[in-house]
Amino acid sequence: NLSGLTKRYEAGERTTDLLSRYLTALSSAYMQEKQGAVAAEYLNALSDDEIVTKDNWELIKKNVSDPLSKPIRQVIANIGRFYEVAGKEVVDYKLENSIKGAVAEITYWRSGNGEFDEARNAELIKLLQSLDYAFIPGALASLYTAEYVRKGDYKGMLNSMREAFKYNVFRNGEEQMYFQNNIEALAGCDDKALVQEGVDWIDTRCAQTKDFFAKANLMNSKARLLTKNGDTLGADKAKMEEEKYNAEGEKRSGGKAVRAIRMN
């Protein structure tokens, strides 16, 4: 199937039906790079008037995820027209996922991940500042805090986090991920007082958190920071607390829910 579709594509056929089937086949074959290149070659050549069709929307929805790409920028620029062909809820959902994916790539970047793309970061911030969706303030707060982490300015990071919580910019439980990702950056901080500040904040949040799996995750973070500060006894105690909260979470769910396993 894939080889037949490839031959037709290479022979110059470009109907949306062929493209849709070819891109699906590439996706099934885990050929993401080729899939992205094929989608981009077709979609990037379309004008605003040409791109606004149901078929093209389906191609964008399934094959384009970068909010800075030309097709998604065209969706944003012609949002009302795309709402008409695809429905507001569907279009907004796609945009939110695309933007959050791009934000996560930046916020989870650490110094061992190769060179940081400053230009892309600046472009993304500029795009977000021009949009008005409920999730945008949280996304921007994440990008602003991430800059302090990259610079190793941990005091600035803590202040940035406090600012974000003061204005209550997160929704749907996103603040938990934001808090944990950033507070754990203190494991790279050599100022023991600042690391302890992070530990104390974790304790405060844990006391305010009702979800037992979330409490377990916070204790995992606490153990990492106490280890950084050389408090092995405290770290062991935090790990025991983590296990206790995890067991309670499983018990309360009747064994139906399990906590996501960390890979690091």
Where are these regions (language model features)?
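Oxidative protein folding and maturation machinery
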Residues: 1-264
